[in-house]
Amino acid sequence: MKLIIFTGLILFPIVSLIEAQAKNEKACLPQYQVCTDAPGNCCSNLICDCYGRYKNGARIGRNCFCLQKGVLYKKEN
C-alpha cells in the first residue's frame, strides 16, 4: 500500500511537468492563418491583425489573420 502511494506521489509531478511543457511548446500559427480565436498564437515575427466585416454599414463579423509586423495592407480596386 505504501509503495502504491509513493509511486503515485512520484508520478503526479512528472506527468504535470510533461503537460506544462507541452502547453509551452505548442505550435505557432504561420503567416495568413486565421487567429480570431487564438490572438496570441502567431509566430514571433507576426501579429494577429483583425478587420471588421460590414454589410450596408452594419457590422456582420470580424476576421483576424497572422500578418507581418509593420506591413500595411490596402484594398485594391
From Swiss-Prot:
Subcellular location: Secreted
Keywords recorded for this protein, A-Z: Disulfide bond, Secreted, Signal, Toxin
Post-translational modification: Contains 4 disulfide bonds.
Signal peptide (residue range): 1-20
Family annotation (InterPro entries): Spider_toxin_CSTX_knottin
Predominant localisation class: secreted
Propeptide stretch(es), residue numbers: 21-26
GO MF annotation list: toxin activity
Pfam families in UniProt: Toxin_35
Tissues in which the UniProt entry reports expression: Expressed by the venom gland.
GO cellular component, one term: extracellular region
The family this protein is said to belong to: Belongs to the neurotoxin 19 (CSTX) family. 08 (U8-Lctx) subfamily.
The protein's name in its UniProt record: U8-lycotoxin-Ls1k
Organism: Lycosa singoriensis
Lineage: Eukaryota, Metazoa, Ecdysozoa, Arthropoda, Chelicerata
